């Protein structure tokens, strides 16, 4: 089992780090009381091999001593990585002023500036227990995400999941699409009596469309467009990219084009899915 502990001052980016861990498949628990670490791992044993918890100043006093005790009693074979995120007082004050969020220690009737300084002192012993110290004062959320991935994976690369979805315009456009292509101008197998009851997944329809130069050219141009811009989309820390392909009914042309694009991109480094909305609805 792999356990990641994320701690740090409020406003330094703990929630960003947890989102990165969640994207990497970790079971994440925010603000877990330290005495519960052992019982959490025991409950998740066998079902989740990747676990991440965040620890902040609200957990309990003398956190460093409790943490040392908990880490000493971790189950055998637990691989531990820990982060402490920090920012300068000036940056934290600016972030809180911009977001207008309440600092965890503001309830003790101290000013925001005093709460920030007090938290830094309270967390100082805990920071000494962490493996990795990240100063986020000059980092944006993407740069912080890259640093966390670099430490955990040895690489900043993030697996992008590409979903190719076929649909029929007469049934409405998919709202989750990042890119949408209209293939209603392509030759339509619907007008071939022997092909009408079939779908774009059937070989006769695939052979018919594969013989059409216009179809092949359009697929190639979509492929070229996506290959050109995928690196830029990945650098923007996307987790999913949905490419919607629409024809009139979502039965022939859009299904075939989505399948062909999925096959071409499945040979690369990305995880690729093909989904056919109207065919799924027909089965249901």
UniProtKB/Swiss-Prot annotation:
GTP binds at residues 56-59. ATP binds at residues 8-15. InterPro entries: P-loop_NTPase (IPR027417), RapZ-like (IPR005337), RapZ-like_N (IPR053930), RapZ_C (IPR053931). The keyword GTP-binding applies. One of its GO terms (molecular function) is GTP binding. Keywords: ATP-binding, GTP-binding, Nucleotide-binding. Pfam families: PapZ_C, RapZ-like_N. Coiled coil: none annotated. Displays ATPase and GTPase activities. Belongs to the RapZ-like family. This is Nucleotide-binding protein SO_3964. It comes from Shewanella oneidensis (strain ATCC 700550 / JCM 31522 / CIP 106686 / LMG 19005 / NCIMB 14063 / MR-1).
